[in-house]
């Protein structure tokens, strides 16, 4: 009984903390849409804000789904309703659908701000304007939109219909397009630039390399013929961590070093920071 009560409290906590994501997303969208300074149009904004805007859309639309899911889990455990648990007559695959409908967009909540940070760092240390500003901005919105259409690729071996598997596979490959647009535009920004390899730039370059590996391994998981063999293997773990650690963490560390002098008024030690960037890589 005590163990069951602990789970109910955990579900309650998860439900309540979801409001922080929803309200933060609303705050960012309202701020970006209504509180830009005079003269700043949509295409005058920093690309980091485009990434934050796309992230906020995901937070507002995806978080309520996981909130409903944990609420149903609470009701099921408290009143023995048959929703997800087979012993009560529920369907665990339904839980998978609800869980992944939130949890796949959630990885884009983590990676999109990192992409925005890289889009800010590269033009500064390549000493030339970002290449393809509008393409990068629109690709952030495209990633946010497509992120809601691919959750079934986590469930290729769960007993879905062949048609559903085919559509989810196709849509998963499609999300590589706006991602590749970013990679190619970042590379074009570097081309013929006067590159300074300061610490933020090292993290940004590390992001591009490691994230590209993560993206390419994702193509093998998107393809039905290879996914059925790779599901539940360390290949999936490697793909995820190349994207989340090689991507998100590298970008966030780069952003911390990039904005640290502006935030604190103090410069970080360049030698030790470069060494840490190489060690993290």
Language model features with spans:
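Membrane-embedded and interfacial regions of multi-pass energy-transducing membrane proteins
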Residues: 1-281
